[in-house]
């Protein structure tokens, strides 16, 4: 119990307290609190500390035989006692993060309606489009500072999950709190239910969402606009994170709102920021600079192109021209290398397409220029996979890359693990342990020739909690590109491999609080420099970060009335 903070004054008592997850303490209510709040007999006699509760909960957690059951168990604790939930996760962050988020959350999304137990967050359905403000008013959280919102159309690599996508905002906000210290009282997960095009869901009698094909076009755009306006009117200072929107909507929504409201898209910008931060760390470990790299991408969707644009921006900041930087980045998708004469390039792909004149001197390539063709002709030093298709980083491709690059940087980032382009074990064996590897999903350490290699997880959780904390602490009105670039550089500064020459490429999850605070300071400092918030000194910003950092400790309660 944190006795250094002032007590909270509660206007209600009895069973209602035990049903409020933000204030419930369960068996940790003191004798005085049990008397004053009419709780005697409603909980067992013994008065326990939060650590004793967490120990019991951990034993129960370990008793489950599969990850989905563990996920459901943790969600049940979260829905009954949030402070205990976050203490449990904090104590076991490396073990539990894959359970509360990727990869287990994907299965939880697929089975959302079948496993539904208790409400959390808000479902805003298209038939209720004229009552959005009323729905926002129904939220159990009224001091909302961070919203994660999805429409469920592109959940991880699993496609359209309808309202089952709610598992993603819930899981993401759990990481905002457990990694970034954002009080759960300030977070709100939202799912925009605009129908589903998943026939299995439409035919499933247990599906709980709006049984209707997805809306699109002007109807969809007007619904998103109504939602954004309603949120801004009710909570004008709230940070909105867009999550798992389909490629056709993700970039247009971001472009439409990023300069109007405080918002960002984690799939595009967060993924890009953590990838660039990891690349900066890998380059430092390899004794080189990012602007010297030749980079090949497999996957040219919004996430891949977002990473590529962030890399180009960082290269330019290191002293080369935008035009030169773009010649060093090759994007390969299902149709082969993106070229400027292709007729069906998406708007966000056009600036990343290679000029046909740049490949005139290439040799031995097919009509649709493959990744292997790119590797053989450009001799890349960096290979990034965001294709969502397993096994595409073949032994031939990796060995060809290693033949011209002593320490290749290889990031198979697709989620979940079943969709990774190549496993770290294969990559390290094919390169005799010389590759610098980071993945999008968690992998066990790999042993090559008696040496153990820890696999860095290029996980957005290293970035977005720090961005959120920095925005809240600084009061930034927008999330600028410069703030995102600052988050990448701050992450690279925390790399054990870059700092000491040994250890993993990215910090351990056990150090995530320090990493998030470091990123928050970098993000907040840029917000101040860009005039996106009120002027403040570095000292005041640091104090604000510490003051906004919530810890899972019980507070003392006092009763306001009888």
Curated annotation (Swiss-Prot):
A divalent metal cation binds at residues 243-244, 267. The record marks 267 as: Important for activity. The active site is at 101 (proton donor), 172 (proton acceptor). Its cofactor is Mg(2+); Mn(2+). This is NAD-dependent malic enzyme. Homotetramer. It is an enzyme of class 1 (oxidoreductase). GO terms for molecular function: malate dehydrogenase (decarboxylating) (NAD+) activity; metal ion binding; NAD binding; oxaloacetate decarboxylase activity. Keywords: Metal-binding, NAD, Oxidoreductase. Divalent metal cations. Prefers magnesium or manganese. Belongs to the malic enzymes family. Its EC number is 1.1.1.38. Transmembrane segments: none annotated. Disulfide bonds: none annotated. PROSITE patterns: MALIC_ENZYMES. PANTHER family: MALIC ENZYME-RELATED (PTHR23406), NAD-DEPENDENT MALIC ENZYME, MITOCHONDRIAL (PTHR23406:SF34). Gene3D superfamilies: Malic enzyme, N-terminal domain, NAD(P)-binding Rossmann-like Domain. GO terms for cellular component: cytosol. It catalyses: (S)-malate + NAD(+) = pyruvate + CO2 + NADH; oxaloacetate + H(+) = pyruvate + CO2. The gene is maeA. NAD(+) binds at residues 154, 267, 415. One of its GO terms (biological process) is malate metabolic process.
